[in-house]
C-alpha cells in the first residue's frame, strides 16, 4: 500500500502552507466574544491569496484555467486550512466546481469554472436538508415544465450562503430522481434567513418558493448528488484532520512546558497515556480520510460502494476529533478556556464540524447496512 503523494499534490501542500502561514488562529473571530455572527463576511484577503496562488483552480481542468488535480489534492489543502481555522468557503466552492465539471453541461462549465478559479465566483452547497436530520435531497422538490424547472422547499444551515454567487441545491422529482439546481443567490422566489453556526459563522435558511430555473442550470446526471455529498463529507473529514492535528500539537507543546511538582506534566503517565491515545485517533482519521479521498479520485468500483469508505472516515473524524479536543481542554486545565488562547476557538470549530459530519452511530448503522447488502454469498 502506497501512502505517498505525487509531486503535484506535494506542491499543492507547500503552496497552501505558504498561504495559510499568514493566518493567526488566535486572531480568528471568537464566538465566545461576539454575540451573533463573528463577522459579516468571510476572509476576503485570504480568498484573494488563494486565487493568486492558483489554489482555487486546483481541481479545475486545464481547459478552464486550472491544474486538473484530484480530490486527494483538494483534501491535502483542506487539511492545511483546518489547521489554522481558515474562514473561507474553500471546501464548498471547490467541491461544487468539481461536481459541475464532472456532471454539468458544457455551457454551465464554461460559465462558472473560469470565474471560480480566479476567485470571482463563490459557490456553496445546501446539504443539510430541512432540519439537518433528513436527506438533503428530500427537502426541495423539482418539477420540469416547458424547458424550465420549478423548485419549492426549504434547506437549513447553508454555509456562506449570503456571500455565495450560486448555491447548489439538491432536489427530488416526481420520478424519485435527485437533481441539482445551480441556483443564483439573487433570484425571484429565493429568500435567505440568517442563522449562526456553533463557531459563529453566518449560515442561512434557504427558502425556494416557485423558483424558476432554466434547464441549462440543472445537473440531472444520475449519481451526481451522491458523489457531491460524499466529496463534501470527505472534505469535512480533511478539515477535521487538520484541526485535530493542530490541537494535538498544541497539547504536546503545552504539556511539555507546563510543570507541576518540579516536572513537565507530559512526563506523568496519566497525561502521557491520554495524549498518546489522541495521537492514535489522529492517525486513524488520517488513514481513513485518504482511503475515502483515493476512492473518490479513482472512481472505480470496489467490494463496497465509495459511500462505505466515506462512512468509515466520518466515523473516525466525528468521534476522533471530539476526543482530541476534549482531551486537549482537560490537559490544558483552565488555560484551555482562556479566550486569549486559541484552543477555545478550535473547540467551537470542532463542534461545527462534528455537527456537519453527523453522529458516528448513524454512520456505523449505515456502514452495517452496506456490509449486509454487499456481503459475498
Which residues fall in each region the model found?
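A short core secondary-structure module
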Residues: 126, 154-190
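Glycine-rich phosphate/cofactor-binding loops in nucleotide/flavin-utilizing enzymes
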Residues: 2, 13, 334-377
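A structural signal for short hydrophobic beta-strand segments in well-ordered beta-sheet cores
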Residues: 140-143
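A short, Trp-centered hydrophobic/proline-enriched beta-strand micro-motif
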Residues: 118-130
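Amphipathic, small/basic residue-rich leader segments at the start of a protein or domain
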Residues: 1-87, 369-377
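Glycine-rich beta->alpha junctions and the first turn(s) of the following alpha-helix
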Residues: 2-8, 12-14, 82-83, 190-283, ...
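C-terminal helix-coil-helix/basic helical segment that borders enzyme active sites and/or dimer interfaces
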Residues: 24-38, 252, 256, 260-263, ...
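N-terminal glycine-rich flavin-associated loop
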Residues: 87-107
